[in-house]
Amino acid sequence: MRDNNAIYGGEMSAHHYFREFAYCDSGMIPWLLIIELMGRKEKKLSELVKDRQQKFPSSGEINFTIKKPEKMIEKVLKYFQDQYLYYDYFDGLSVVFEDWRFNLRISNTEPLVRLNLETKKNLDLLNHRIKKLTKILMSE
């Protein structure tokens, strides 16, 4: 975060890091921000979550055990090479398309590759892309 002057960093394990909090983990700051948003929008948390899930259906973190993860990640990128808008390796492999995106990264704490996928308002596309990526990743 310091190298990139990032304002925020987060993990699926519910760790939240903030530049203005000395780059330290805080669970209280996200809750305060959510409470502020609830008040501003005059909505319950369940309503905010439902709205977000409908706008951006997501897979959640899907874990794979893969023998040669670096090679498999390159295989995934090659498979989509004529389809994506752009990609980067900031935190694993992140690939962005017109109406969906995914991140594939090697876990730092377990022998796993983690997939997170998100679409724009399209649950069918989400399920289709999860199946496609699972098929590629399991094709060792």
What label would you give each PLM region?
Residues 1-140:
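Phosphate-binding and adjacent anionic-ligand microenvironments
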